Amino acid sequence: GVVFPYFPRLGRYNLNFHEAQQACLDQDAVIASFDQLYDAWRGGLDWCNAGWLSDGSVQYPITKPREPCGGQNTVPGVRNYGFWDKDKSRYDVFCFTSNFNGRFYYLIHPTKLTYDEAVQACLNDGAQIAKVGQIFAAWKILGYDRCDAGWLADGSVRYPISRPRRRCSPTEAAVRFVGFPDKKHKLYGVYCFRA
C-alpha cells in the first residue's frame, strides 16, 4: 500500500480528527496507522506538516532533518506531537490506500479543461474523475508515470512521476502537487478511474 499526506482546498491544518477520517474516505483511502506511517518513513517519506493518525495522535515523518521541521541537528524519525482534542485541534492527515480495483489513466483529450469539463469528460469515457488515493496507488503500486498535470476529484491538480527526469520532478519519484487552481480555468488535463 501507500501512505500519502492530505489537506483540503481550505489549506493546511484545517481538519479535526473526524474530518480527517472522512477526508481519507473521500479519497478512496483510510486514515493511516502509526505502523503504516513508520513503514512509509522507512521507505523515504519526508513531510514537514503534522497529520492525524488512526490512534488520534498527530505526527510527521522526517528523513532529512532541517530547520523548520524540528531542527537541523535532530535525528531522522517520525516526530510525535502527542494526542490532541479530536474535535477542536486541526491538522492535516495521513491516509493509506492499498486497494486498486480498476484502471487509472490520463484522458487523451484535444483541449485543456475546466474542472467541470474534466468531470464530464471522464463520465463521457465511461469512467469517473480520479481521486487522490487512486493517483497515489497507481503511482506506488503500478509505477504509473505521466508528466501531465491533471484535475482530480477534490479539485486539486497533480501528476505522478515514477521515473524522475528533467522538467518532470528531476530530484525524486513523487506525485507532484500543482495546487487547487480556480476551477474555471482551462489549463489542465484530467485523470480518470474506471472501476
Question: What are the residue ranges of the model-derived segments?
Answer:
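Extracellular disulfide-stabilized recognition modules
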Residues: 1-18, 48-51, 66-113, 148, ...
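An exposed tryptophan-centered "aromatic clamp" motif
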Residues: 36-75, 79-85, 133-182
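Conserved hydrophobic ligand-interaction patch in extracellular adhesion modules
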Residues: 12, 17-44, 106-110, 115-146
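C-terminal functional regions that serve as terminal interaction/effector modules
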Residues: 180-182, 189-190, 194
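Tyrosine-centered aromatic motifs in long, intrinsically disordered, low-complexity repeat arrays
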Residues: 60, 91-94, 159, 188
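Beta-strand cores of modular interaction/reader domains in eukaryotic scaffold and signaling proteins
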Residues: 30-31, 94-96, 128-129, 191-193
